[in-house]
């Protein structure tokens, strides 16, 4: 379990997260919803260890506790943490002309027995991760020439390579933290990526937290929803329980209604 308890984050005297607690369970996809500036990326940064709880970090005051598999997050050294959790940040374009394959192989360095010494098996994992991300055709491409959506798929393959389970070895629960992974993707690739995330959460025993802006995507692909507003969780639970007009209005300040899609999966959320 990845736990955050009573998180308080403030920057320049302004509260960003206020007494927030959340649990990310292995084998479960949790979608984090909220309007712009609600604190979603800040929460993901604290859970990733980029904003350590218990003091000042990057100009922010962070208080509260974060534990990964029962161990305080701050007590886990960087190499081991990189094997236990992977982070896909919001889109950033590489400044150097790496190939897509080289970017994906970056996810394997935490597993190298010697610094910088990747193996043939690491190369095979990179190829399989590219295939899972629907990015095999991009393998040899210079990443500075890729579109936003193509680059997003390559970076998704990188975090898959980072958490790829070794054959025949028992693994502790691991965690995948995704910051708007579908933002640059077309409709088909949005659903393909989230389908893959949900399947791997079960097959690899991953706890997943993904920030998404479209509640309809969350309704179809998440096991749990957490809604964030003004730095606090205002609703959390199963999609059918949370994605209702009243909680959505509290989260977004926007009135909606639910329309039966006729497929028995989830209603469609549309403006009221």
Swiss-Prot record:
Q: Which GO terms describe its cellular component?
A: plasma membrane
EC code: 7.6.2.-
Question: From which organism does this entry originate?
Answer: Burkholderia pseudomallei (strain 1710b)
Q: Which Pfam families match?
A: ABC_tran (PF00005)
Record InterPro entries: AAA+_ATPase, ABC_transporter-like_ATP-bd, ABC_transporter-like_CS, P-loop_NTPase
**Looking at the keywords, is Cell membrane present?**
yes
| Family label | Belongs to the ABC transporter superfamily. Heme (hemin) importer (TC 3.A.1.14.5) family.
Protein's UniProt name:
Hemin import ATP-binding protein HmuV
Subunit structure and binding partners: The complex is composed of two ATP-binding proteins (HmuV), two transmembrane proteins (HmuU) and a solute-binding protein (HmuT).
In this chain, ATP is annotated as bound at 34-41
Q: Where is this protein found?
A: Cell inner membrane
Q: What does the function comment of this entry state?
A: Part of the ABC transporter complex HmuTUV involved in hemin import. Responsible for energy coupling to the transport system.
Primary gene name: hmuV
Report the membrane topology from the UniProt record.
Peripheral membrane protein
The source's domain of life comes to Bacteria
User: SUPFAM superfamilies from the xrefs?
Assistant: P-loop containing nucleoside triphosphate hydrolases
- Domain ABC transporter: start-end pairs: 2-255
Q: What GO terms are given for molecular function?
A: ATP binding; ATP hydrolysis activity
Primary localisation category: membrane
| Keyword entries, A-Z | ATP-binding, Cell inner membrane, Cell membrane, Membrane, Nucleotide-binding, Translocase, Transport
């Amino acid at each position: 379990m990845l736990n955050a308890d009573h998180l308080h984050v403030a920057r320049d005297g302004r509260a960003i997260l206020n007494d927030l607690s959340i649990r990310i369970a292995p084998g479960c996809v949790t979608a984090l919803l909220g309007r712009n500036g609600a604190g979603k990326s800040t929460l993901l940064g604290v859970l990733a260890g980029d904003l350590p709880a218990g003091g000042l970090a990057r100009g922010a005051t962070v208080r509260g506790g974060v534990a990964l598999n029962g161990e305080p997050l701050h007590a886990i050294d960087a190499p081991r943490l990189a094997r236990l959790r992977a982070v896909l940040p919001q889109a950033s374009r590489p400044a150097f002309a790496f190939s897509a394959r080289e970017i994906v192989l970056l996810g394997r360095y935490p597993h190298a027995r010697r610094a910088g010494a990747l193996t043939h098996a690491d190369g095979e994992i990179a190829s399989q991760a590219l295939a899972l991300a629907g990015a095999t055709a991009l393998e040899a491409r210079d990443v500075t020439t890729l579109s936003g959506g193509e680059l997003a798929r390559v970076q998704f393959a990188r975090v898959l390579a980072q958490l790829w389970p070794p054959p025949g070895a028992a693994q502790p629960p691991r965690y995948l933290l995704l910051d708007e992974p579908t933002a640059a993707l077309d409709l088909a690739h949005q659903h393909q990526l989230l389908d893959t995330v949900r399947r791997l959460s079960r097959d690899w025993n991953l706890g997943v937290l993904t920030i998404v802006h479209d509640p309809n995507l969350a309704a179809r692909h998440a096991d749990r929803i957490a809604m964030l507003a003004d730095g606090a969780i205002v609703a959390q639970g199963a999609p059918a329980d949370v994605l209702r007009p009243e909680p959505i209005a509290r989260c977004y300040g926007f009135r909606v209604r639910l329309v039966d899609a006729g497929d028995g999966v989830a209603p469609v959320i549309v403006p009221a």
